[in-house]
Every structure is written in structure tokens, then in C-alpha cells.
């Protein structure tokens, strides 16, 4: 069946539905540049309320397995590809891409000129889009949504035994972040995004992790006073959305990139190690560099492609905040040492970042 992808810039792209579309869906349209890792992308809560375009021309050739989910379900609004493999050619595959999306009633649009579509997004910027059975566009503006509430846990759960006790504040965390901490011998308590500082104090953590998540960080501005209290009390590692919240809580300014960074091959310069690391990224917002002038933060990580801020460290407090995903999945594990550096501050109670 034919369907139409209408983008807010006024253009329309047609394709064929490989997974059902009952009427229409809308969301912010973004693109992912990795050749692999589609299963992790689909189940990353950070993609909540977004329509994802995969730039690689063939997606789904190794299917969907039971081990590479980043959460219990996919969070994207729709998937757009040039070609979707009808089978998963891997011994661990349980479903094809289309079968998996059909199970969750997420539309899959194929045979789209994704090259032209991505060029339009790069030119016009990230924008709203609508996938519809009608060739007539009715794309609206950006919806006033609060996606973090939809993906954050509603209960407090603890994983692992012994080791340092960390509280992971869940703004939409990826399973791989939890696994990276458990693999290093930590005991991790996952709490809802709006857990009060007093409730976290009662858990007696040795350190704090602020997770990734979807949406505009300013939608969480009501939580900035609580975040400010927490990062003053505990060694802190902040990732992606958590990084932006640390910046906002300490008076920094965030800005939106034209089309964001989404891929498993983003080069980042580490000013401490004096080396370039390949990173996995998924974000539309960055910390504005000028807002760090005269503040007690140093820029440690810089995106090689566009010079944007990819990570900051506090000069006097054990706060390490990164825009990229050190846990990867998908992507290289070049920056896994970030977890080790964070745990050094937890064990020693001192700042070793700078």
C-alpha cells in the first residue's frame, strides 16, 4: 500500500508500507547514520515521539534478536528506510524488521528516496513530519509533549549486589548503561525521574547517574533545583539528556542543532587524553560553549565534525557530564573508560577528571 511522508518544510516523499498504518502518525523527523544497530535504536527511549530515517540503504538484514533490546519495547513513532530486508539472516534472529514493527503497530515505510529526504532534513533542519495514507499534507507545529514521563520507570528497583551503591535517575535510560555499571561490580538503584532529593538521600547512594532520555531538556526545568542539590552532594555522571540537565541546573545555556547527531561514528576529541574517540550519539541539543565562560566547568570533549561541546567537567567537584553515549550499543566502546573514571571518584572521593 502506498503512503506519504509529509515534512513541515512543505515537501512530500512517497513509499510503500511494509508494516501497517491505520490512519496517520506524526513526530519529529530525524535520521540515523549507522550501518547497523537498528534494533538498539528502535528500543532506545530517547527516540520517543520521533520518526526515524535510516540512511543506510538496506536495513533489517540480520533481523531482530532477543538480546539487543535497550528497553522492553520500541519507542519510535514510525520507521523510514529505502529497503527493508524480508528476512533476518542471522542465527539469533527471531523476527524480521517488519514482523517486529507490526507486532507493536509501528508503521514501516519503504522504497523512500532516503538520500533526498536526509538532504531536506539537513537543509531545513529537524522538523515535524506526518506519515499518512493521504497525499495531502496536514503537518502541524511541534507538539507540546512531555515524553520523559512516558518512558521513565514508576517504581524504584535495585539491581546487583555489593560494590558501590549508585542511584540511576531514569529519564529514559538505556539498558546498556545499567549493564555497564553492573559489569563493574556496582549495585544500582533505578528511580523515577521526579524522585525527590530526600528520597534519594534515604537510599544512601555513593554516587549518582543522570541518564539519557527524550525531548527538550527545558521541559524538565521544574526539576533543576532538585538536580542542583543532588550534584552538590554526590559524585555524578551525567549522560546525554542528563548532561544537558546538569548544564541547565548550573546556569549554562542549551541550543538546538540544525539536524542533531545520531549515529555510531561521531568523532570526539578528549582534551585530557589528547586523542580522538569514536562515539555513539543521539541528541538534538548541546551546551552553548559561550555559556561556560567564567564558570567552574572545563570543556573536556569536543565534536570533531562541528566543534560542539560533547562533555564538561567541574573543576572542584566530582561531576563528569558527557553528551555522547559511553555505553555505546550501538557503536564503538572507545569511551567506556568514562564509567571507570566515574567510579574512581566514587571510591576515592576525589576529582580525577581533569
From Swiss-Prot:
Enzyme Commission number: 6.3.5.5
Active site: 240, 325, 327
Ligand binding (L-glutamine): 46, 213, 215, 241, 244, 282, 285
SMART domains named among the record's database cross-references: CPSase_sm_chain
Molecular function (Gene Ontology), one example: carbamoyl-phosphate synthase (glutamine-hydrolyzing) activity
CPSase: region residues: 1-163
Binding partners and assembly: Composed of two chains; the small (or glutamine) chain promotes the hydrolysis of glutamine to ammonia, which is used by the large (or ammonia) chain to synthesize carbamoyl phosphate. Tetramer of heterodimers (alpha,beta)4.
Family: Belongs to the CarA family.
General function of this protein: Small subunit of the glutamine-dependent carbamoyl phosphate synthetase (CPSase). CPSase catalyzes the formation of carbamoyl phosphate from the ammonia moiety of glutamine, carbonate, and phosphate donated by ATP, constituting the first step of the biosynthetic pathway leading to arginine and/or urea. The small subunit (glutamine amidotransferase) binds and cleaves glutamine to supply the large subunit with the substrate ammonia.
Protein's name in the database: Carbamoyl phosphate synthase arginine-specific small chain
Amino acid at each position: 500500500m502506498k503512503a506519504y511522508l509529509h515534512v513541515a518544510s512543505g515537501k512530500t516523499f512517497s513509499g510503500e508500507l511494509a508494516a501497517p498504518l491505520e490512519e496517520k502518525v506524526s513526530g519529529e523527523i530525524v535520521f540515523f547514520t549507522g550501518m547497523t544497530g537498528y534494533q538498539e535504536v528502535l528500543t532506545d527511549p530517547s527516540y520517543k515521539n520521533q520518526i526515524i530515517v535510516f540512511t543506510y540503504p538496506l536495513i533489517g538484514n540480520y533481523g531482530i534478536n532477543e538480546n539487543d533490546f535497550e528497553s522492553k519495547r520500541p519507542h519510535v513513532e514510525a520507521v523510514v528506510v529505502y529497503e527493508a530486508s524480508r528476512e533476518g539472516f542471522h542465527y539469533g534472529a527471531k523476527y524480521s524488521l517488519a514482523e517486529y514493527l507490526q507486532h507493536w503497530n509501528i508503521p514501516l515505510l519503504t522504497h523512500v528516496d532516503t538520500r533526498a529526504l536526509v538532504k531536506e532534513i539537513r537543509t531545513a533542519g529537524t522538523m515535524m513530519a506526518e506519515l499518512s495514507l493521504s497525499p495531502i499534507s496536514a503537518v502541524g507545529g511541534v507538539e507540546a509533549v512531555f515524553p520523559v514521563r512516558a518512558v521513565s520507570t514508576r517504581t524504584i528497583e535495585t539491581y546487583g549486589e555489593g560494590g558501590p551503591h549508585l542511584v540511576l535517575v531514569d529519564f529514559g535510560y538505556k539498558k546498556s548503561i545499567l549493564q555497564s555499571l553492573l559489569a563493574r561490580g556496582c549495585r544500582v538503584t533505578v528511580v523515577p525521574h521526579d524522585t525527590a532529593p530526600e528520597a534519594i538521600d534515604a537510599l544512601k547512594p555513593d554516587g549518582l547517574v543522570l541518564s539519557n532520555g527524550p525531548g527538550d531538556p527545558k521541559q524538565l526545568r521544574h526539576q533543576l533545583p532538585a538536580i542542583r542539590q543532588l550534584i552538590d552532594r554526590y559524585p555524578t555522571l551525567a549522560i546525554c539528556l542528563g548532561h544537558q540537565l546538569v548544564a541547565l541546573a548550573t546556569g549554562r545555556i542549551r541550543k538546538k542543532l540544525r539536524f542533531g547527531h545520531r549515529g555510531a561514528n561521531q568523532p570526539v576529541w578528549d582534551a585530557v587524553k589528547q586523542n580522538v574517540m569514536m562515539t555513539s550519539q543521539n541528541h538534538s541539543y548541546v551546551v552553548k560553549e559561550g555559556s561556560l565562560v567564567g564558570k567552574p566547568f572545563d570543556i573536556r570533549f569536543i565534536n570533531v565534525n562541528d566543534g560542539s561541546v560533547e562533555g564538561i567537567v567541574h573543576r572542584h567537584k566530582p561531576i563528569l557530564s558527557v553528551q555522547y553515549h559511553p555505553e555505546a550499543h550501538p557503536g564503538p566502546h572507545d569511551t567506556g573508560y568514562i564509567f571507570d573514571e566515574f567510579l574512581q571518584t566514587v571510591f576515592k572521593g576525589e576529582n580525577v577528571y581533569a
